[in-house]
Amino acid sequence: MKRQNVLMVVVCLGFVMQIGPRNVYAQSDPGPRGGDAGAGGYYSTLGAGEQDIFNQALDAFMEVDSVSGLVANEGGTGLGPTFNGNSCAQCHAQPAIGGSSPGLKSPQHPVPNPQVALATLDGATNRVPPFVTADGPVREARFVVTVTQRGFAPDGGVHGLFTITGRTDAPGCNLAQPDFATELGRHNVIFRIPTPLFGLGLVEGTSDATLRANLDSTRERRSRLGIRGQFNTNGNDGTITRFGWKAQNKSLLIFSGEAYNVEQGISNEVFPNERAALGCAFNPTPESLAGIADPGEATAGTGGAAATGPSDVVKFANFARLTAPPTPAAATQSSQSGAQLFEKVGCSLCHSPSLTTDKSHFTGMSNVTYNPYSDFAVHHMGWQLADRVTQGAAGPDEFRTAPLWGVGQRLFFLHDGRTADLLQAIRAHDGRESEAREVIRQFNALTPAQIQDLLNFLRSL
């Protein structure tokens, strides 16, 4: 009997040793990295004058806007008539000013979704849409189609979550919110969350030739894995567009002007016209002007001195242009192993680890090799991720390769913020029509320990 017991113990131990690594070591997203923010602040080599430009831009980026500019602590002008936020820094906040959506689970600055309180700020009478929650991401909403007399037509545009109706600085305005309940019932609403702005001056300073050469350098291996990729381009001159979820914006100035217009309702030199009905227009248009007298700023508590410097839109672009890229965490044995696996399974074929800038006007930003982990091309991601919106050459299921620098401290993932779990975000790439499907198959074939190493690597970025 004793000999049988010993044999049974040996057999059981051998069985546990055989299955142990798969069952005991369950892979999981480590979560957003703690400690100091690995991003924020100006690019380290900038000269004193360039640092001043950045600091002025930062002030404008953090400014809170109201309709009139006369509300206490809301000195910016031009909010509305429809809007999603009242400050650039409100949406771009994690892990530091210029980042992605804030949230309650931030190790750096835990805050609820600011859009919830914004709905009724200063007397506004908005209802909070059901897709905006205290513990969820900041979102914008777009309608896939719009109803016309002949049926339906493509839409794809941003529909502001809120209006200025009821606000103390918007007397007489009576503008209804979009009927989100009806459109949600039609499955006609898609969402997007803020993209981080860190290091975008380096991205802007990378030539089209460099981007095309980078994509060509992996063509053979990509072809074997079913990865194609193309660049979204400007319809006039054919140059590569690279900013936004679908790489739909050609320049940081256009990116900035669009953000002011569709997110805050502020008309500007790039988008000069209001987007809502008459009766709710309280300011001259455009409301943000570049290099000329700006009466709106003069009435906003500047002592009558009209602003003659760069507009807020130009300052936004300068902020993104001069902000330093994210700094990764110190490497560990696990993250180093994960970096090798990232290359082995093919993640790096789209998430290119490094690119090099061309000549730059800014000190220390010429011929710089940087690590965005993106090819800035758009790829078919399949209908599981498709938003059914076309922007330029980017079709309904195509998205720009999301840069992974800074992903270690990000709270929400994918274009619509549908998950806070990095592992779920990776596996969501496994759609039937997705170019990443074979890469995800190889990822899923890794051992749990290897998957954990890869996750640890990503959270170190």
Predicted regions span which residues?
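Positively charged n-region of N-terminal signal peptides that target proteins for export
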Residues: M1-Q4
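Bacterial N-terminal signal peptides
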Residues: M8-Q18
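Periplasmic c-type cytochrome electron-transfer domains
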Residues: N23-L461
